[in-house]
Regions:
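N-terminal Rossmann-like NAD(P)+-binding subdomain of aldehyde/semialdehyde dehydrogenases
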Residues: 1-89
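Rossmann-like NAD(P) dinucleotide-binding subdomain of oxidoreductase/dehydrogenase enzymes
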Residues: 82-172
């Protein structure tokens, strides 16, 4: 756990300095690589949660739609917000990354729920550590494999944790 946290903190120190546009370009490659494995992922979903294979396409299609949408609005939504009230001073709100985001994803829609946290967090300059349900461990591994090919090292990590260790991470 400590090694993963430390490597994510170290990676975030440089990831956050890429422009939003640069991060979005890399994340689009991440999504593309992940979805290129859709047949393998569909079979794994069936084995892990017992969902009919005919329904796997819906989850992966939803993953793509959500990721594409969030990445398409990232530059606008992460831009500085001008709150200037007079001409003597320029006032603005600057959005800054938080650091490392720990995401816990459930078993029932493991990709569809994870995408809602991991893509915006990374687009904003944070690194992500994903903990999937013990019932769907291969989901985190598939995302990690795509991250290894397309993102800087340790921007996306995963941990397989039991309940006790998961609580330790979130309480620390």
């Amino acid at each position: 756990i400590e090694d993963t946290l430390n490597s994510s903190v170290k990676a975030q120190a440089s990831w956050c300095y890429l422009s939003v546009k640069e991060r979005v370009e890399l994340l689009n490659k991440f999504v593309e690589d992940f979805l290129s494995k859709k047949d393998v992922i569909a079979e794994e979903l069936c084995r892990q949660i017992g969902r009919p294979i005919s329904q796997a396409a819906g989850e992966l299609g939803g993953f793509k739609e959500r990721a594409d949408y969030m990445l398409s609005i990232a530059e606008k939504k992460l831009a500085d917000i001008d709150v200037t009230k007079d001409n003597n001073f320029k006032n603005f709100i600057k959005r800054r990354p938080l650091g490392v985001v720990f995401v816990i994803a459930p078993w029932n829609y493991p990709y569809l729920t994870a995408v809602n946290s991991i893509i915006p967090a990374m687009a904003a300059g944070n690194c992500v550590i994903l903990k999937h349900s013990a019932q769907t461990p291969l989901c985190a591994e598939q995302l990690y494999q795509s991250a290894q090919k397309t993102l800087p090292k340790n921007v996306f990590n995963f941990l397989h944790l039991n309940h006790k260790d998961g609580l330790k991470v979130v309480s620390d």
